[in-house]
C-alpha cells in the first residue's frame, strides 16, 4: 500500500503542475479585487484566511486550518480554492476517502471551477480510487466511472500552456487519459459490467496497443463474461505475452497461464505437443496483429467430446488421411487415447525392450492379402512373449495413439499389448530320447 501511495503522490504532483499557474493567477486577481468588497463576493480578511491555509506546509495542520475556514465561511466563493487544497492535503495524508470526498465537492461547484482544477482533482480522485479496498471500490464504482468520464472531458478543455508545443502537450495528456480510461475499466469490472470494461480497456489500447497490463486485463474480462468469450480472452493474453514492453519473466508467466487456460478449455486431455502447437500458432498471430482475425478459433472440450463419442480407429484413419480441418479436430480428439483390439498384419518384428512391431492396418481379408508396407509402429511394453508374433500373421493390439505423420501416412503407438490369442504358443523343448541299457549278454553257463 505504501508503494501505491508513493506512486499516487508522484503522479498527483505532475497533474497539479498543469494547473498551478492558472490557480496562482486567479488568486492574484482575487487579492487585487478583494480590497474593494463591492466588486468581490468575499472580504480581504476572508481572502487572507484562505491564503494562510494555502501557505501551510504540514498536511494535518493545513486540514485543521481549512476546517476552521469552512466553519467560518461555509458559502465562501473561495471554496473553489479551498476544496482542491483539501484534496492535496488528504493525498499527502494517504486518506483516499477524503481525497474522493473533496474532489467530488470541487466538481459539484460546476463552472465556477476552471477546467484545469477540475482535471487535477479528478485525476487525484482516480488515483485514490485505485487504492481503495475491493468492497469500497465496488460501492463507489458508479461514481468512479462518472468521475473518470468527467476527468476526460475536463482534460480535453485544459488549454495548452504557452511554453509547450502541441506535440509536448499531447504527450503530457497521454498518461492522464490512460488513467481515466483505466479507472473506468476497473470500476466497470467490479460492477460486473464487462462490456463496459471492454470498451474502456480498448480505449487504452487505441492509445497504446502494446501495453502488457491492459491486454492481460482485457483477457481476464473476456474470460469473466457469461458465457466466457474464450477466443477473445486467449487473443489478448497472447498479446500480453508478445508485448515488447514485457520482461522475460512477465512474458513467461502469462504464457504459462495462457497455456493452462487453453488446456482446460479443451478438456485437459489433449496431447501436450498439440497444445504447444496451438499456443505457438496463437502467439505468432497475436505478435503480428492487434486485432483477432474473425476466422481464428480453437475446438472446445465439447467439440472434442462430440468427435470422440462415435470415433473408431477406422474412422480415425479415414479422417486423418482426408486432411483439412476435419483431420485437425480428429487428431485433437484421438491423440493420447487408448484404442482396443486394433487389427493389423505384422510386417516386421524387432525384439527388445520394448518390442517394436511394424504393422499394416487392415479391416478385410482383401486388405490383409494386399498389405506389404507398414503404416503403424507399435511399442509393446511388459509383454516379452509378444516377440513370438510371426511376420505376415494377423494380430490385434490395444495401445495408446501418441503421434502420426501425415506424409507418408504413419501412426505411432505406445504402451501396447498384443491380444494373447494372437501370440503363438511357446514351443515345448524337445524330449530327450530314453536311455537304452545294453542288453545283458547271456551267461556262458
State the predicted function of each range.
Residues 56, 93, 132-134, 138, ...:
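Structural motif corresponding to the intra-repeat A-B loop/turn of tetratricopeptide repeats
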Residues 152-159, 257-258, 264-332, 417-445:
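Pro/Ala/Gly-rich low-complexity, hydrophilic intrinsically disordered segments
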Residues 25-83:
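N-terminal leader/linker segments that initiate helical-solenoid repeat arrays
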Residues 140-154, 223, 227-249, 259, ...:
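TPR/TPR-like (Sel1-like) alpha-helical repeat modules
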Amino acid at each position: 500500500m505504501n508503494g501505491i501511495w508513493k506512486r499516487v503522490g508522484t503522479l498527483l504532483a505532475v497533474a497539479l503542475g498543469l494547473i498551478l499557474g492558472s490557480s496562482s493567477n486567479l488568486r492574484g486577481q482575487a487579492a487585487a479585487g478583494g480590497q474593494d468588497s463591492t466588486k468581490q463576493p468575499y472580504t480581504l480578511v476572508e481572502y487572507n484566511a484562505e491564503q494562510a491555509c494555502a501557505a501551510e506546509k504540514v498536511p494535518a495542520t493545513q486540514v485543521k486550518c481549512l476546517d476552521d475556514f469552512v466553519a467560518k465561511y461555509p458559502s465562501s466563493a473561495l471554496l473553489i480554492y479551498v476544496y482542491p487544497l483539501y484534496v492535496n492535503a488528504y493525498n499527502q495524508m494517504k486518506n483516499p476517502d477524503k481525497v474522493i470526498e473533496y474532489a467530488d465537492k470541487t466538481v459539484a461547484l460546476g463552472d465556477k471551477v476552471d477546467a484545469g482544477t477540475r482535471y487535477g482533482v479528478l485525476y487525484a480522485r482516480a488515483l485514490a480510487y485505485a487504492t481503495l479496498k475491493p468492497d469500497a471500490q465496488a460501492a463507489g464504482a458508479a461514481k468512479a466511472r462518472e468521475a473518470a468520464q468527467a476527468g476526460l472531458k475536463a482534460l480535453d478543455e485544459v488549454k495548452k500552456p504557452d511554453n509547450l508545443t502541441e506535440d509536448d502537450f499531447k504527450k503530457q495528456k497521454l498518461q492522464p487519459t490512460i488513467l481515466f480510461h483505466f479507472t473506468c475499466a476497473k470500476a466497470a469490472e467490479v460492477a460486473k459490467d464487462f462490456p463496459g470494461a471492454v470498451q474502456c480497456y480498448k480505449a487504452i489500447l487505441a492509445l497504446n496497443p502494446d501495453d502488457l497490463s491492459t491486454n492481460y486485463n482485457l483477457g481476464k474480462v473476456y474470460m469473466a463474461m457469461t458465457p466466457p468469450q474464450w477466443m477473445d480472452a486467449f487473443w489478448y493474453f497472447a498479446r500480453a505475452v508478445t508485448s515488447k514492453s514485457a520482461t522475460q519473466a512477465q512474458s513467461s508467466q502469462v504464457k504459462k497461464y495462457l497455456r493452462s487456460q487453453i488446456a482446460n478449455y479443451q478438456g485437459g486431455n489433449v496431447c501436450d505437443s498439440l497444445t504447444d502447437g496451438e499456443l505457438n500458432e496463437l502467439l505468432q498471430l497475436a505478435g503480428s496483429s492487434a486485432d483477432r482475425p474473425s476466422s481464428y478459433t480453437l475446438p472446445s472440450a465439447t467439440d472434442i467430446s462430440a468427435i470422440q463419442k462415435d470415433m473408431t480407429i477406422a474412422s480415425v484413419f479415414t479422417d486423418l488421411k482426408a486432411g483439412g480441418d476435419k483431420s485437425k479436430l480428429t487428431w485433437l480428439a484421438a491423440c493420447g487415447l487408448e484404442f482396443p483390439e486394433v487389427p493389423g498384419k505384422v510386417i516386421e518384428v524387432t525384439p527388445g525392450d520394448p518390442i517394436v512391431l511394424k504393422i499394416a492396418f487392415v479391416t478385410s481379408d482383401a486388405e490383409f492379402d494386399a498389405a506389404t508396407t507398414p503404416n503403424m509402429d507399435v511399442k509393446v511394453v511388459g509383454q516379452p512373449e509378444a516377440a513370438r508374433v510371426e511376420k505376415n500373421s494377423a494380430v490385434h493390439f490395444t495401445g495408446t495413439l501418441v503421434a502420426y505423420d501425415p506424409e507418408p501416412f504413419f501412426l505411432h503407438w505406445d504402451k501396447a499389448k498384443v491380444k494373447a490369442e494372437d501370440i503363438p504358443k511357446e514351443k515345448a523343448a524337445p524330449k530327450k530320447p530314453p536311455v537304452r541299457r545294453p542288453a545283458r549278454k547271456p551267461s556262458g553257463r
